[in-house]
Amino acid sequence: MKLTMAGIKDREAWEKAGIQLPGYDVEEVSEKARKSPRWVHFGIGNIFRVFIGGIADGLLEEGALDRGLTCVETFDYDVADKIYAPYDNLGLSVILHGDGTRDYKVLGALAEAVKAQSSNEKQWNRLKEIFAAPSLQLVSFTITEKGYALQKADGTWFPFVEADIKNGPAKATGAMAVLTAMLYERYQAGKHPLALVSMDNCSQNGARLRQSVLTMAEEWKKAGYVDDGFLAYVSDEKTIAFPWTMIDKITPRPSEQIAADLEALGVEDMQPVITAKKTYIAPFVNAEKPQYLVIEDSFPNGRPALEKGFGVYMADRKTVNLAERMKVTVCLNPVHSATGPLGVALGYELFAHMLNTDADMMKMARMVAYDEGLPVVQDPGILSPQAFVDELFNDRFPNEYLGDTNLRLAVDVSQMVGIRFGETIKAYVEKYGDASRLTALPLGIAGWLRYMLAVDDAGKKYELAPDPMNEEIQEQLKDIVVGQPETFTDQLRPILSNERLFFIDLYKAGVGEKVENMFREMIAGPGAIKATIHKYVNA
């Protein structure tokens, strides 16, 4: 069986293999989207296909949507060439339940894949056509937090952004320049309204997207590429809206075991590929079932019936912000960042296996969420923080079939310690005067810095997960030797007092010395990490 339009015509074979096929006419909904696009998405990797593509697929099944999605890739064109084209834009969703069972479903909601490549005239002109269409209601984005960035930490432009500003809309390369160039096309085609919906996992994502688009437009105005009318068009949120969202679904890399299992069921060519740009992707996506997408209901050109989608909630901006803060600062992400790097240093590959087999790590994870997070979280109303955390610990975190690794959870932690730890620490300072009553969060911070030494609890070396601050932090810690606590003096002070990192000086918050003491205990020698965690979570 081939995952192609011709291949899925053999319904009996697919159903016999236990794989559900679309109940709607895939060719018809794809054709309708090509003629009259309604929903475009930028960043067409794993989370998009299984979550956003899955929502659209569900709406098509219900008759709540009448056409597919237009998929646009701005970064890694191999994804369009290797994962979309050979499979006629079909995807295969593999939902992994905690009892080991799986749901297989072919997704037919992805109508067309376009490469946002200004040097490819045919693709670029197609993108212009799509953005000029009055029927277009929304453009959604999963391009990662980095996709919105125009400037380095020192405030200077990234070189590709500098080139985009200089070369103008016709030669745009970066995602923000491509988007702004396409908005200029839409402006010239009749100033049609549009909603631009960031679905990336970062705080106030809509504001971040808006800032980047306005910056690009202003720079092009200065360079003479666009006029004042265009600036007014993109600045008016009644015409071009930037709704905020909160997104949540654990989507690990595609599993080679699942690829082999699918091929054993008779589905051909399921092996994952690693592109030249290091995207790890396959014709299928494996993910957990639970999902949450809270969207600010601000759509000046109308919208599909998104609220009918599985796990989708429409709300106002304040509610979206509270839901996002609940997830990112309290419930889910702090647990990942506090325990994932420690898990690497303790030698646990899988996050779920660690929690299921190490009572102290489970206790620490629960302390982060229940004991230290929930007391200072604001209730968003549409989702109960208590119920959200209960589901995490009862169903989501223990699911070993997800295959989520501690190393994945250690990626880019330096970029997240402010929002994931700092916000809760600040809330304690506001409520109690200082944060000295906290234990699990300081333990997580100490554990992250202990992980940065790249030597595990048995004394073996390992490679760190990618993080833009790896070199800088390792340089600061280079004289510290595991097994020789006397080599640790004041090396952590510049890190723990850095308000750019933690959003607060941890010493002024009353936890800096506590982190230092925990770190000192963790470097005593073999087994010291395990002993330190045991001591503090059972105190």
Task: Give each language-model segment a name.
Residues 1-539:
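Substrate/ligand-engaging "lid" and interaction regions
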